[in-house]
Amino acid sequence: MRLPIAVGALAAIAAGASAFAQGISDPGERAFQYCFSCHSVEPNQTEVLSGPNLNGVIGRPIASKAGFEYSDAMKSFGAGKVWTPELIAQFIQDPKSMVPGTVMEKPPGPRNPAERAALLDYLKKPR
């Protein structure tokens, strides 16, 4: 009985986020709505969410954002690497396939290459 309720709740949340995102004119910011419940891009965000702050993520060493506790899997995967747009695009399509043992689940979007490109452009913007 709990599973149908949980699935229904998730569907309602996704529908609400989708409706909210439709009012956002920037396609990258709209694509980021898939991410904002776990991540922030605000430079002065002090509250630690369930995912690291993504402000300045492109070009940053993987698993290096101060104040966030990364999984051992992510630390191992990221050793000596930096986030590139290509790596991020690949990672968000299936995090657990790319980094077995990561805590991050597969997000419901961005769903297609155009949305992913818009998201990456959004993440590149200085704040």
Residue ranges, per PLM feature:
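Bacterial N-terminal signal peptides that target proteins for export
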Residues: 1-7
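Bacterial N-terminal signal peptides
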Residues: 7-16
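Electrostatic cytochrome c docking/interface patches
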Residues: 15-32, 42-50
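Short, cysteine/histidine-rich loop/knuckle motifs that typically chelate Zn2+
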Residues: 34-37
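Detector for the c-type heme attachment site
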Residues: 39-45, 59, 93
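Short cysteine/histidine-rich metal-coordination sites, predominantly Zn2+-binding motifs
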Residues: 51-58
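Short Fe-S-cluster ligation motifs
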Residues: 64-82
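C-terminal capping alpha-helices of c-type cytochrome domains
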Residues: 82-127
